[in-house]
């Protein structure tokens, strides 16, 4: 049976332990500016996926990935010392795609703003296809129209072939 609350608590604890150790405990020069963004632990608490971002170039990201791979054993033993679980979960470091996704979303939003500005410019210089006011107005009865019919149905009863309904 999976206890999601326990897995979430363990993930939060692992995130804190690993982030602290990366900040203060690892002296590898290949390790760049790393931010632990998320940790996900499986339901059986046997495996932890640690998502991280690196500020820098692609080369610095590759160097940081190599440094994390070499430090995985030390980080796992540190996690094992600081959590209260029977078994220490295995650790896997995954480069998080958040910065790339954020840049792609920013580019899409900028494209949408540009297109909105183009549409607004076209709307200002455009002309209406019909009347300026497309809504139907109530009919105003003029003096030249037949107003003298008492029953108001505007039927010419003197026309040839007219027969009243029975």
Curated annotation (Swiss-Prot):
Pfam families recorded: RBFA
Predominant location: cytoplasm
Biased composition range(s): Acidic residues: 143-154
Region of interest called Disordered, as start-end residue ranges on this chain: 119-166
InterPro entries in the record: KH_dom-like_a/b (IPR015946), RbfA (IPR000238), RbfA_dom_sf (IPR023799)
Keywords, comma-separated and alphabetical: Cytoplasm, Ribosome biogenesis
GO biological process: one example: maturation of SSU-rRNA
GO MF: ribosomal small subunit binding
Entry annotated with the keyword DNA-binding: no
GO CC, any one term: cytosol
Localization (cell): Cytoplasm
Family: Belongs to the RbfA family.
Task of the protein: One of several proteins that assist in the late maturation steps of the functional core of the 30S ribosomal subunit. Associates with free 30S ribosomal subunits (but not with 30S subunits that are part of 70S ribosomes or polysomes). Required for efficient processing of 16S rRNA. May interact with the 5'-terminal helix region of 16S rRNA.
NCBIfam families in the cross-refs: rbfA
Quaternary structure annotation from Swiss-Prot or TrEMBL: Monomer. Binds 30S ribosomal subunits, but not 50S ribosomal subunits or 70S ribosomes.
HAMAP family, alphabetized: RbfA
Name of protein: Ribosome-binding factor A
Native organism: Clavibacter michiganensis subsp. michiganensis (strain NCPPB 382)
């Amino acid at each position: 049976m999976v206890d999601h609350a326990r897995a979430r608590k363990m993930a939060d604890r692992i995130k804190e332990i690993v982030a602290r150790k990366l900040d203060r405990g690892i002296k590898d020069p290949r390790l760049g500016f790393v931010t632990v963004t998320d940790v996900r632990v499986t339901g059986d608490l046997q495996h932890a996926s640690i998502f991280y971002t690196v500020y820098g170039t692609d080369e610095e990201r590759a160097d940081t990935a190599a440094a994390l791979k070499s430090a995985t054993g030390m980080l796992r033993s540190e996690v094992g010392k600081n959590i209260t679980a029977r078994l220490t979960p295995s650790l896997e470091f995954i480069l998080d795609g958040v910065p790339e996704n954020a840049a792609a979303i920013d580019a899409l939003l900028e494209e949408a703003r540009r297109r909105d500005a183009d549409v607004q410019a076209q709307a200002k210089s455009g002309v209406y296809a019909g009347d300026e006011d497309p809504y139907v107005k109530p009919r105003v009865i003029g003096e030249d129209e037949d107003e003298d019919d008492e029953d108001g149905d505007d039927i010419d009863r003197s026309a040839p072939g007219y027969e009243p309904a029975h």
